[in-house]
Design a protein with these regions (language model features):
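Family-specific signature for flavin-dependent thymidylate synthase
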Residues: 1-112
Length: 112
């Protein structure tokens, strides 16, 4: 038996400036303003999209995050369907090696 800690890691390399440029390119299609793209225009354009409530354009970007958490937490994340998910199966457990269990996070009970 192997006890592991809950954790997370961002699997996608992130370049904020490039992300903003790709979102701007997609968003300017909606406003027929592709000709107004400059080296410096992405940040203010994306801010404008958010202020106008045009958040669907932000969905043109994605990142991959790996969460190691207990099944209860993963089911809560998945049921709200905020993204696309791939989840480790409990069906294909390898019993010939160490079985991994996630150490549950318990808040400081003295505070309650």
């Amino acid at each position: 038996m192997k006890i592991i800690e809950a954790s997370h890691s961002i699997e996608t390399p992130i370049d904020g400036a490039e992300i903003l440029k790709r979102i701007e390119k997609a968003g300017r299609t909606c406003y027929k303003s592709e000709d107004r793209i400059t080296e410096e225009s992405a940040k203010s354009f994306v801010r404008m999209l958010i202020e106008r409530g045009h958040e669907s354009v932000l969905e043109h970007e994605s990142i991959t995050v790996r969460f190691i958490c207990d099944r209860g937490i993963s089911h809560e994340i998945v049921r709200h369907r905020l993204a696309s998910y791939s989840q480790e199966s409990q069906r294909y457990v390898r019993y010939n090696g160490d079985i991994e269990f996630i150490n549950p996070h318990m808040p400081n009970t003295k505070a309650y």
